[in-house]
């Protein structure tokens, strides 16, 4: 078998991709997590035996816009901590997450958050709060040029956009997060049950 034929077979199998003028590259394994429980990305990656890291891109206090204020149940222009991070799976960029923290936890998070530190661990260990319920949405969106560059060479122009509004046991908002995940490297697995079947089983 020739090298050219071997590369063609690997490309057809979806194991490599080619870039004109640069050569052939190994495709990263797609990571899939179950969307059935409230977990952090760190926990999801641990379940997959993949090291999870983060790089802080921005950490600042800003006035809450109308959308963020509504999600956090606070008045517009209330100071909130905005944490923007590049999330890593192993050494490879996976997502850009922008988190807006409720004023009751934001200042404490600022003191303890750092690269490769779990936000949920800081919330529990330093703030004494734990997200127990969340509303999450998924859609496909177009990355800005700087976001595409940040997510690595050959990152697709489209990404999976997520939003999450997390609450504590008292149903008070803790955070509102907007994530942009590489669609070629990350996916969600969702299990569903028919309500009609459940109703028949009860009768």
What annotation goes with each model-predicted range?
Residues 28-203:
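All-alpha effector-binding/dimerization core of bacterial HTH-type transcriptional repressors
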Residues 1-26:
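N-terminal helix-turn-helix
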């Amino acid at each position: 078998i020739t090298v050219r034929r071997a590369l063609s077979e690997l490309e057809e199998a979806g194991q490599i991709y080619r870039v004109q003028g640069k050569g052939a590259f190994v495709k990263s394994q797609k990571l899939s997590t179950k969307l059935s429980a409230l977990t952090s990305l760190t926990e999801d990656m641990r379940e997959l035996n993949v090291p999870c890291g983060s790089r802080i891109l921005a950490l600042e206090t800003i006035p809450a816009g109308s959308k963020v204020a509504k999600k956090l149940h606070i008045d517009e222009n209330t100071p909130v901590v905005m944490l923007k991070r590049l999330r890593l799976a192993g050494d490879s960029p996976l997502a850009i997450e922008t988190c807006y923290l409720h004023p009751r936890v934001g200042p404490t998070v600022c003191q303890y958050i750092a690269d490769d530190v779990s936000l949920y661990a800081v919330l529990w260990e330093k703030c004494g709060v734990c997200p127990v319920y969340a509303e999450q949405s998924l859609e496909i969106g177009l990355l800005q040029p700087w976001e595409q560059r940040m997510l690595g060479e050959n990152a697709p122009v489209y990404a999976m956009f997520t939003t999450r509004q997390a609450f504590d046991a008292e149903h008070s908002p803790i955070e509102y997060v907007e994530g942009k995940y590489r669609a070629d490297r990350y996916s969600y697995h969702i299990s569903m049950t028919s309500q009609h079947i459940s109703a028949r089983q009860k009768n």
